[in-house]
Amino acid sequence: MALDQTAEIQMETAKTKETIPFWLAVSITVMFILPLGLYFGQYSLPLWVAFIVWAEYFALGANLGTIKTIIPAYTAGAFWGVCMILLYTWLATFMTGASVYPMYIALFVGVSVMVYVMKYFKVFQTGSLAYFNGLSMLLAVYFVGAHPTFTTNAYVLVLLSGAYALAGGYLGWFIGWFNVTITFPRPIAPKPAASTRV
C-alpha cells in the first residue's frame, strides 16, 4: 500500500545581496587609497604591499574575523624580516669580500628560526600566507627603497622599512574590509525548499 510522505522542509542557507556591485566597490576602493601612494613624495606608502594584503583578506575569508589571523601573522613575518636585515647589516660591517655572504648567513639563520617557531603558534600555521608575505614585503620594501631616506644610518633605514611594510600591510587589511563594507550587503531571507510528495 502506497503511503503519502511529505518531504521535510529545509531552509536555504542565509545569503546576502550587494547594494553596490562588487566590481564597482573595488574601483571605488582603488580611487580611495591612490592618494596615499602618489602625493606624499618619499613618505608615500608602498601601495603594492597594501594590494597584496588586500588579496589575503579575501583568500582568508573576507570577513572581520580575519584580523585575528592576518595582523599577528603578517606582523610577525615582517618582524623576522627586520631581524634578518639587521643581522645582515651588522655582519656586513666586519665581513670583508662579497657582500652576499652576510646576506646568506642572515637569511639562512632567520628563515630557519622563522619556520621552526611556526609549530608553537597556531596563528602562524593558519595564517602562513600572511606570515610569509610579511617577510617578503619587508624584504621588498627594504631592497626597493620604498621608504623615507632622510638618514644614512643603515640600522634606522631597516626600521623604517619595517614601519612602512607594516603600514602597507595594515592598510591592505583595512581596504579589504572597506571594500566589502561599501557593497552594503543586505541579508536575503531564507526560503523553504519546495515540498515533494512520493
Regions found by a protein language model. Name each.
Residues 7-8, 182-198:
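Short, highly charged, low-complexity non-transmembrane loops/tails of multi-pass membrane proteins
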Residues 27, 43-62, 108-114, 119-150:
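Pore- and pathway-forming membrane helices of multi-pass small-molecule/ion transporters and channels
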Residues 14-19, 58-70, 95, 99, ...:
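Membrane-helix interfacial "entry" motifs
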Residues 20, 24-36, 68-87, 105-117, ...:
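Hydrophobic, lipid-facing residues on alpha-helical transmembrane segments of integral membrane proteins
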Residues 35-50, 96-108:
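Structural signature of hydrophobic alpha-helical transmembrane segments
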Residues 1-17, 193-195:
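Short, Lys/Arg-rich, polar N-terminal cytosolic tail immediately upstream
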Residues 82-92, 139-154:
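Hydrophobic alpha-helical transmembrane segments in multi-pass integral membrane proteins
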